[in-house]
Design a protein with these regions (language model features):
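Beta-lactam-recognizing serine transpeptidase/beta-lactamase-like catalytic domain environment
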Residues: 5-238
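Short, gly/Ser/Thr-rich active-site loops of penicillin-recognizing serine hydrolases
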Residues: 156-161, 180, 252-265
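A short acidic/glycine-rich loop-to-helix N-cap element
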Residues: 236-251
Length: 265
């Protein structure tokens, strides 16, 4: 799920496109350590051991994004995250815990951070802002909870004033991200968010958070992809009651689908 932020940084850099080729082995050897960054189930991301950036997003290839994060660098990753709102504590009107990317990262830590692990901290609101920002062709809006307050006579006492927070990515980059996220739902890890007759853009996330604990299942999405009406972020802590099958695609994506369907009816 945080891979969307990494891809945004890479595409904005100008040196990468969705067709850029990245390593996709079963496990990525990390510098400065004997540790590796494994892919899901310790299998390669493709038969050739290489993937394009788009393919890496579709199958959520950990080694590819770990390698990409190390190549673009910690500063670029933090700057891109900040453009989406990381580090801010917005008022909605109550204060919201800020999301964060660690300030100091060596190469192995940067690789782990690039798949949303190590010490990356995000809230559901922040990831909803990422989804909405991409859906809005790069423009991130300031969040709020209440659209309007209406009196007993149905007159509007107070209403929210939508304001732009930042331009996280260019419209071109947002369109490229949308293309990748639609493919993720059409044919990748997010198929359980598919809605008949609607193009859905989405990204799974499976966040480990301690030895012996089941992963948090995440999913972010927006729809319709060509004319977005809703953006969603779902987290199922500890995978809910999913048993051993805990992943964003299997647990959180169906919930996001139901939320989007309810809005689009």
């Amino acid at each position: 799920m945080f891979k969307v932020v990494v891809a945004a940084a890479a595409l904005s850099d100008g040196e990468y496109t969705e067709d850029s080729v990245l390593p996709g082995p079963a496990a990525l050897d990390l510098p400065l350590t004997s540790a590796t960054l494994p892919n899901h189930d310790d299998v390669p991301c493709s038969p050739t051991g290489e993937v394009t950036l788009k393919q890496a997003m579709v199958v959520s290839c950990n080694p590819a994004f770990g390698d990409l994060g190390m190549k673009i660098g910690a500063d670029a990753l933090r700057e891109q995250a900040a453009k989406f709102g990381f580090g801010d504590s917005p008022s909605v009107p109550m204060r919201v815990t800020p999301s964060s990317v660690p300030a100091e990262l060596d190469a192995p830590q940067l690789a782990q951070s690039s798949i949303g692990q190590y010490d990356v901290r995000v809230t559901p609101m922040q990831m909803a802002m990422v989804a909405a920002g991409v859906a809005n062709r790069g423009t991130v809006m300031s969040p709020y909870l209440v659209q309007s307050v209406i009196g007993s006579d149905l007159s509007v006492i107070e209403s929210a004033d939508p304001t732009e927070l930042s331009q996280a990515v260019s419209p071109r980059v947002a369109d490229e991200l949308t293309d990748m996220l639609v493919a993720t739902v059409d044919e990748g890890t997010g198929t359980k968010a598919q809605i008949p007759g609607v193009r859905v853009a989405g990204k799974t996330g499976t966040a480990e958070h301690g030895e012996g604990r089941r992963a948090h299942a995440w999913f972010i999405s927006y729809a319709p992809a060509d004319d977005p009406q809703i953006a969603v972020a779902v987290i199922v802590e500890d995978g809910g009651v999913s048993g051993s099958e805990t992943s964003g695609g299997s647990v959180a994506a169906p919930i996001a689908k139901q939320v989007m369907e309810a809005r689009l009816k």
